[in-house]
């Protein structure tokens, strides 16, 4: 009635996330599309509008300095390995050129961040190959194909 529309934001690639977890999120998104369009004729403007009103994009989990995710041991270890970040004995990041390079690499959260060698920064338990395929499918608007990975 009021024309207010809630928008869910989806994030993939969290530490510990498995491919089945990602598929569960995709299934929920597709269910939302189904519910939003169930009484509408496919191919109509109304159907398209209702379908597009459901956010089908996903951001990549990004470890921003100072966040709880950034302070977790697996994330610190990955960033140390892939960006050369150093941490104090208390787990605080050392502000040096490696940190600067990492921060400068933080761009659009919809994109996969890569290290200086082009390797993806993947905090999840999803293989790099599958994560990159999933990210590509999302970018192409083919989110449902993730269910077949």
Where does each model-flagged region fall?
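A structural motif corresponding to the C-terminal lobe/cap of the Radical SAM core domain
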Residues: 1-148
